[in-house]
Curated annotation (Swiss-Prot):
CDD domains: M20_peptT (cd03892). Its EC number is 3.4.11.-. Belongs to the peptidase M20B family. It is an enzyme of class 3 (hydrolase). SUPFAM superfamilies: Bacterial exopeptidase dimerisation domain, Zn-dependent exopeptidases. GO terms for biological process: peptide metabolic process; proteolysis. This is Peptidase T-like protein YPO1009/y3403/YP_3421. It comes from Yersinia pestis. Keywords: Hydrolase, Metal-binding, Metalloprotease, Protease, Zinc. Binds 2 Zn(2+) ions per subunit.
Amino acid sequence: MTIALSEQLTNRFFRYLAVSSQSDAASPTLPSTEGQHKMAQMLAEELRQLGLEDILIDEHATVTARKPGNQPTAPRIGFITHIDTVDVGLSPDIHPQRLRFTGSDLCLNAEQGIYLRTAEHPEILRYQGEEIIFSDGTSVLGADNKAAVTVVMTLLENLTADDCHGDIVVAFVPDEEIGLRGAKALDLARFDVDFAYTIDCCELGEVVYENFNAASAEIDIIGVTAHPMSAKNVLINPIRVAYDIISEFSPQETPEHTEGREGYVWFTDMTANPNSAKLKIAIRDFDNVSFAARKAYIGEVVAKVSAQYPRAKISYSVTDVYSNISNSIGEDKRAIDLIFSSMAELNIEPKVIPMRGGTDGAALSTQGLLTPNYFTGAHNFHSPFEFLPISSFVKSYQLTRTICLSAAKA
């Protein structure tokens, strides 16, 4: 008996979630965690069983493979998904569950008293009566991005010789959540396609071909230590210097006070002791001019505060992380056009959004490979209340399949 598509997707998704593959920003290695090696090995073995060609798993836990097409004139389409889940201080182990939403608050974990409150997450109200996948509230769900891994692998399993399509090339990469490290290291000679897609984040219908420009900055401060009994006119407290630096930035241009296409500067980490302090900063903006100005302002603030504390030593660095996909859109817009035509065929209403984040596609688009993004169907990423309506999960799969088949007809 043929298993229902919803069951096929859910069963595979749960199997992938059973492999703990949280990334670790503090690790200098690629991948940053051993669990990602395990995830990559699992996928490589499944690809072998499915009969794909050119399967390669490298030392960085990047897996690439090709499903040969039967339409030689069709474009080569790529799908890139990431195998890590995010570390936000929750458990690295994910315990998924299927619950039917009846319209009331949902108990995710009775033992720990964890509830999803509809007043706090009103977006769930549109899924009344539906089956939805949640974690048990002790971790993220990991639909970001294992729902996408599931969609792609299920497509590769289900395509038959009767389905007309071009070559489909897949890449499963590590450490997206800690700076797109895997995508940046991907050899595009291995991922040789005409255009590609990520399936990362986003509720049903959402399409992304515009995202933040992103940079990171670090400011290092060395003060002057002294015993408090003789500190007058001697001691330079690096924590106070750090406070003065932070105070130079608008409190309204932060993630919690901005939306849409508004950019921000976000102080993400601070370590300090009586001798030194370090600040870490995330810089985000859609507009290229504003983005450059925000990066330059870091240096202006350091110069200003250095003048106030001439005996302190203050240094800084700014590093670009990824750029706006829209910067890379040229005359060939087939990748984007196929999303919309395929959505129309499936009666899915598109919702184009400027993504206040980035995907592996941002790294690839910067290298000249246009890689727009569309939905998995999930909500509340990076949260214990992340959830994935199964109906939306199915639609994500159907869209992925339709894109591949429609491209061969164009």
